[in-house]
Regions:
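Non-catalytic, surface beta->alpha helical segment in thiol-disulfide oxidoreductase systems
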Residues: 59-84
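Generic recognition of short, well-ordered alpha-helical segments
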Residues: 16-20, 42, 69
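Nucleotide phosphate-binding site architecture
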Residues: 13, 35, 65
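Thioredoxin-like thiol-disulfide oxidoreductase module
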Residues: 34-51, 78
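Local sequence-structure signature of Cys/Sec-based thiol-disulfide redox active-site neighborhoods
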Residues: 1-28
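Thiol/disulfide oxidoreductase modules built on the thioredoxin-like
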Residues: 45-53, 64-69
């Protein structure tokens, strides 16, 4: 599987849900907190047409926002099982 990077914040409920969804399925990912990494925040703004949407996920060479959290979207975008 290609590397998954989740751009998130510590206060984001949707980020916590997305992280738990991935952990429950044994999916490895790297988390980048955009409140602590200004360059990462700039990237999130760029790929979301100026919107600060978290979580934003990079999978391979493409980005998508999963905000609000949608397990069906996350499962489909990453090609992982919906059910544990």
């Amino acid at each position: 599987m290609e590397e998954i990077i989740m751009y998130s914040t510590s206060w984001c409920v949707d980020c916590r849900r997305a992280k738990q969804f991935l952990k429950d399925r044994g999916v490895n990912f790297v988390e980048v907190n955009i409140d602590e990494e200004p360059d990462a925040e700039d990237l999130v703004l760029e790929v979301n047409e100026g919107r600060r949407k978290v979580p934003t996920i990079k999978f391979g060479d493409r980005f998508f926002a999963c905000s609000p959290f949608d397990p069906y979207q996350l499962s489909s975008e990453l090609n992982i099982p919906l059910k544990k």
